[in-house]
Every structure is written in C-alpha cells, then in structure tokens.
C-alpha cells in the first residue's frame, strides 16, 4: 500500500471516529435533556402529590404552627429585640355592655323575717347588695298577628237611613297576599347571609318553634323583598362606591342550578367589591355573574377612575382608566407553595393585622446554599409585610414617605435576586418567579399611594364570608336567588363593616323602604353611615315595640 493510500485510509478512519464521537455527543446531550425533563417531571409530580395530600389530609390555610427549635448545626439568625404586646383581656362589663339588665331581688321568706332571739320584726339594712350575675337567653318566638279593623258609623245619620263610616288604617302587607312581615323576612335574611344557615335548616328551626314554613316560601320572601325594597339601597351604595378613589376587587365561584343556556353543574361567579382605606365609611358589594369575563368588572366599575386593588387575574385589565394594584399576598403564596412540606412547618407568614408580637424577618445574604430559593422568596415577602405592619397606623402621606424610604431597597434586592434564578421548567418555583417578574410593576404600585394596602386581603375576607354560606348551601337554585343573595350579602357585610347591628339594620330597611322606595331622599337616611341609622341600629332592638305601625319617622 502506497503512502498516499495509507494517508487516505487514516483520514477516513479519523473522519469515521469523529462522526461517531459527534453522534455520541449528540446522543449524550439528548439523554441529558431527557434526564433533566424527567427530573423536572418527577419534581412536578411530587409537588402535585404533596398538594393533593395537603388538600385531603392537611389544613388549607397558609398559617402554620410556631416554628420548632432548630438543630444545633442549623444557622443561628440574630434578630432585633422586641417587646411582646399582649392584648388586654376584656372585662365582663365591656363584653356585656349592650345587654339589657334585669334585677331579681332575692328576699327573705315571710316566715323567716322575725329575729331568732327576740321574735321582733326585722327590717332591711340598706339597698339590696349585688352578689352575682348570669346570662339568660330567650329562644325566638313565632306568633300569628291578626290585624282587626275597627269600623265606626254615625248613629244619628243612621236614623235617617244614611250612614257615615270610618275605618281604622291597616298597615299594608310587606309582600301582597303573603304572611311575611319585616321581622320574619329580616330573620330569614340574617340567618342566611350572616349565620350561613341554608333555607332547609331554617325551615327545620322554625318547625321546632311551631311554624311549618317551607323552604321555598322562605326563598321567595327573600327574593321578592330584595328586589322590591333592598335593591334601591344596593344601587345607591353602588353609586357611592364608584365615586371612591380606591376599590378592592375579587371573585369566587358559585353554582346555579337553573340558568338558561348553562348546565346545572357549570361554574358561575360571585364578584366582590370593597372600598379601600380612604377614611370614608366602608362599602362592600357583591354581584352575581354567570362567568369570569373581564367584561363584568368593566361594566360594574364603569365611571370609576382610581386605584383598583386585585389579584393578577388578567380579566381586570379590561377595566378602563384605572391603575391596577396587585396583591403581594398572592405573590408570597406562590413562593410558600413551592416550599417542601417540612419547610412549611417552620416558616410563619406575617399578618399585618395580627396583634401578635413578631420579630423582624431576616433575609439570608450569606451561606445561601443552606437555603432553598422558595425560602428566600418568602423571606423577602415577609420583610415587606413586616415593614407594612410597622407603618399601618401612620397618616397616608407619612406612610408613603416611609414606604419609599424603607421598602424600595427591599424591592430592589428582591428583583435583582429574582434575575439570578433559573428554576426547573414547570416546577412551582418557576411559577412563583415568573409571577413576580411578570407583575413586578403592579405588585409595587401600592407604593404610589399611602392609602393603598400591600395585599387584597380586605376583599378576600369578604369572599370568605360568602364561601361559608356556599359550603353549607352548595348552590343557588335560580338566578333570581343568586341576585337576591348578592344584594343581601352587600347590605349585611356593609353593616358589619360599619359596626351596625346586622339584624336591626335589615329589619329597619324593611320597615321604612316600603314608604320611600320611589324617592331617593328617604334612602339617604337609610344608608349605613347616616345619623338616623347609627342612632337606631347600633344596639339591640325590640321588635315588639318597633313595628310596622309603630316606629320613628325618618328625618325630613
């Protein structure tokens, strides 16, 4: 074999080996990618399994038990000193201040009122002395009220076979051809939307009291009374809400069995809107809608031009001429959900409104390999919530100044840290990181106004109030029932937020609205913050003395 042939052969061998090496490297690369994907899939499946276990067997709340003592080798974190603020325990006098007092005099029997020594008649030394007190509860009483009309005739005119008659005025029925009274309907609404008691349970309760009223009748009472008497107040609250500068919004699911064009098992939504921390009386409103389209908040909030605090649901982007302020609690929740189960047990999420004394959270800046990224993300969020708790009682302008001074540096470090992360594709950490990156501007928008809150928890708490009823009732039978529930819940939650007696407020509306539903002047006096309502709906009420035919007149 010639020298040239040997070179050509060697060249072919080298090219063949190089081709094989390239193929092997490509195969190795593909296998590595496949291994990474399988690891990612395994991690995602483990996260999903852990989430299912938590949903079925664990608590769903973010709140966790107090952290246990760490092992000796775990890093010790130095924290700033703090003073525990123990909430003062209320006295009996404070707890029972609004209850009527009835005194029972315990006297000495007649046969024992003579002196054992001289048999003289004994007399009282002074006024009876207080010994103890107890709380007595009188069960509800249901009774039938028969309105009997007096008819007068002139006896002199009767002699001439010509009668002059006068009849006593009988109050109009709340609902024509129905035995429903203001107290009965208010009682039903109160137990439905304040106590979360479904109609069938109310029917059972009334049966125990001697009144056999079908659940369908109770539902019809609420639907008709809501539409005829409560709707004008609801609409007036809506007008006032639109004028505000800050509104919280949220939505939660519900089910309506009989809705045209929808299957009974399909999902509908109850939308919640709550006024912000603007120093004005609180307004809470619910609106039923068959879906989750952004057109629903767009229509409900038409005319509102201010700050809309919500979660990062894209539907709110349809609301025009507003600044979206997204909820930082949602962002924190994403990082919290990315934590392993054992880490969740040792991490406590800070609550701005809690009275519990808290240590200032420390954000790890050294030995980062000892911490998982989700743990650091929660630490950044907790730091922001801790600062918010320190500033929550400041005037809005001062609060804004302090926010810019104290929280901007935390945000800058947080966002810079996010840019260093490259989480596994599809895992919960990636979802948390992408959530924070994609919504960083709207998450920080609360810094622009000292009246804004860092979270949308105000609206979420209102959603939970409805969720209690939903858990008990499971569904609404009709669209009319869902709309009635939205109206009643709006008035109940607004009354609660303004420190009114809820039953008394609903009862007062049903007493007065039949006489002023056509005019707005009377409605102004029936709004939760009016002087008339504060005077008559802040304590207890006696429905036997305040009735449809005997109640104070509205101011002129």
What are these regions (language model features)?
Residues 1-176, 219, 248-249, 310, ...:
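Short, flexible loop/hinge motifs at secondary-structure junctions
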Residues 15, 19, 112-113, 151-153, ...:
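Catalytic center-proximal scaffold of phosphoryl-transfer enzymes
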């Amino acid at each position: 074999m010639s020298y040239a042939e040997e070179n050509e052969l060697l060249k072919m061998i080298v090219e063949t080996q190089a081709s094989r090496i390239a193929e092997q490297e490509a195969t190795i690369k593909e296998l590595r990618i496949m291994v990474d994907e399988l690891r990612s899939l395994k991690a995602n499946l483990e996260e999903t399994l852990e989430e299912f276990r938590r949903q079925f067997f664990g608590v769903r709340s973010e709140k966790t038990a107090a952290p246990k003592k760490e092992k000796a080798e775990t890093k010790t974190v130095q924290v700033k000193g703090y003073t525990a603020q123990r909430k003062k325990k209320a006295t009996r006098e404070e707890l029972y201040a609004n209850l009527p007092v009835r005194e029972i005099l315990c006297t000495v029997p007649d046969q024992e009122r003579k002196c054992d020594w001289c048999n003289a008649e004994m007399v009282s030394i002074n006024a009876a002395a207080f010994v103890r007190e107890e709380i007595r509860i009188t069960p509800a009483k249901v009774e039938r009220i028969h309105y009997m009309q007096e008819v007068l005739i002139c006896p002199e005119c009767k002699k001439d076979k010509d009668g002059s008659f006068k009849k006593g005025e009988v109050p109009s029925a709340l609902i024509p051809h129905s035995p429903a009274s203001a107290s009965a309907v208010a009682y039903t609404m109160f137990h439905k939307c304040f106590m979360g008691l479904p109609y069938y349970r109310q029917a059972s309760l009334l049966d125990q009291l001697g009144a056999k009223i079908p659940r369908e009748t109770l539902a019809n009472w609420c639907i008709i009374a809501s539409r005829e008497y409560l709707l004008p107040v609801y609409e007036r609250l809506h007008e006032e809400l639109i004028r505000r500068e800050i509104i919280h919004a949220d939505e939660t699911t519900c089910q309506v069995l009989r809705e045209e064009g929808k299957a009974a098992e399909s999902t509908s939504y109850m939308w919640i809107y709550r006024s912000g921390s603007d120093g004005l009386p609180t307004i809470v409103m619910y609106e039923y809608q068959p879906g989750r389209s952004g057109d629903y908040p767009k229509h409900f909030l038409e005319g509102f031009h201010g700050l809309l605090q919500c979660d990062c649901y894209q539907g709110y982007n349809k609301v025009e001429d507003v600044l979206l302020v997204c909820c930082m609690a949602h962002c924190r929740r994403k990082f919290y959900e990315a934590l392993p189960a054992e880490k969740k047990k040792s991490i406590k999420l800070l609550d701005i409104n809690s009275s519990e004394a808290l240590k200032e959270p420390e954000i790890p800046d050294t030995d980062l390999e000892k911490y998982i990224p989700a743990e650091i993300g929660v630490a950044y969020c907790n730091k922001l919530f801790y600062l918010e708790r320190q500033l929550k009682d400041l005037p809005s302008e001062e609060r804004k100044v302090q926010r810019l001074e104290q929280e901007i540096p935390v945000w800058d470090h947080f966002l810079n840290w996010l840019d260093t992360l490259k989480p596994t594709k599809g895992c919960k950490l990636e979802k948390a990181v992408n959530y924070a990156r994609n919504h960083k501007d709207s998450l920080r928008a609360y810094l622009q106004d000292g009246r804004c809150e860092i979270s949308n928890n105000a609206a979420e708490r209102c959603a939970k109030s409805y969720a209690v009823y939903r858990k008990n009732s499971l569904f609404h039978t009709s669209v009319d029932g869902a709309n009635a529930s939205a109206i009643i819940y709006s008035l109940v939650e607004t009354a609660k937020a303004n420190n009114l007696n809820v039953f008394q407020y609903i009862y007062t509306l049903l007493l007065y609205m039949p006489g002023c539903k056509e005019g707005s002047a009377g409605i102004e006096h029936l709004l939760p913050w009016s002087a008339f309502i504060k005077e008559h709906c802040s304590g207890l009420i006696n429905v036997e003395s305040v009735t449809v035919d005997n109640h104070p007149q509205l101011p002129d």
